């Protein structure tokens, strides 16, 4: 195309439709997952796997944070599009957990919701809370969480993974080519997270997972350890050096 070399970028674990079309014209495709789904075998030689590219602020965080034994800090976030499902259904899960455990919740709400009205039940149940609407790089400023409940966009999961925050993934069920589920499954296969599908979601599902963690932390600690191993050698300098070297070679 115009005698220019084309290098594609694919953060998801299944190739996007635009990238799939352009791949035949491209020199290489940079991706996070060496087992990228949906790619024709004849193009496998074009794959270049790299560690997730995050905002520089993420590489400056101390990710070896000890859990606070006095309370459970939970993050709920739905990504750039937020999640009406999370806003409508996850409050009851937090209330249920608070009856047995001391809980602190940081929750992203869908636009249009009244923050003050939404938090009343949290306050009435003595749940420390921080409610917010979508913010770019929110986790750069707030990252001391024991567990997260999240949609499964590639960037959101990469940020949680880098910060060693085990997460319960609830993929957006209408994502193109089911890419959010496939993103989450990659981490599930590496024993880094739990997955709940929205279509099968029942009241108490979050409680069951978190209660199991509180009773026996072995599985939780294993997931946290696996996340740490995924990112132990990833630094801002190393990732940028690798990219610069690659572009200079091509």
List the predicted regions and their residue ranges.
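A short acidic/histidine/glycine-rich donor-binding loop in glycosyltransferase catalytic cores
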Residues: 167-168, 184-199, 211-212
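Conserved donor-nucleotide binding/catalytic region of nucleotide-linked donor-dependent transferases
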Residues: 194, 200-231, 249-250
């Amino acid at each position: 195309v115009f005698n220019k070399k084309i290098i594609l970028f694919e953060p998801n674990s299944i190739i996007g439709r635009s990238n799939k079309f352009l791949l035949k014209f491209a020199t290489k495709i940079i991706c996070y997952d060496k087992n990228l789904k949906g790619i024709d075998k004849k193009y496998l030689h074009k794959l270049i796997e790299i560690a997730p590219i995050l905002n520089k602020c993420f590489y400056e965080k101390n990710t070896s944070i000890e859990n606070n034994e006095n309370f459970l800090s939970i993050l709920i976030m739905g990504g750039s599009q937020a999640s009406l499902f999370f806003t409508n259904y996850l409050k009851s899960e937090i209330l249920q957990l608070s009856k047995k455990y001391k809980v602190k919740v940081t929750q992203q709400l869908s636009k249009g919701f009244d923050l003050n009205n939404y938090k009343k039940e949290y306050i009435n149940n003595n749940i420390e809370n921080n409610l917010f609407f979508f913010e770019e790089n929110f986790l750069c400023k707030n990252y001391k969480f024991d567990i997260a409940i999240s949609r499964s966009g590639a960037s959101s999961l990469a940020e949680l993974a880098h910060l060693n925050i085990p997460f319960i993934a609830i993929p957006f069920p209408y994502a193109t080519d089911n890419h959010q589920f496939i993103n989450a499954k990659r981490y599930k296969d590496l024993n880094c997270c739990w997955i709940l599908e929205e279509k099968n979601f029942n009241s108490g599902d979050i409680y069951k997972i978190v209660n199991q963690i509180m009773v026996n932390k072995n599985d939780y600690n294993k997931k946290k350890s696996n996340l740490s191993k995924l990112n132990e050698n990833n630094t801002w300098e190393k990732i940028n050096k690798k990219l610069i070297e690659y572009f200079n070679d091509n």
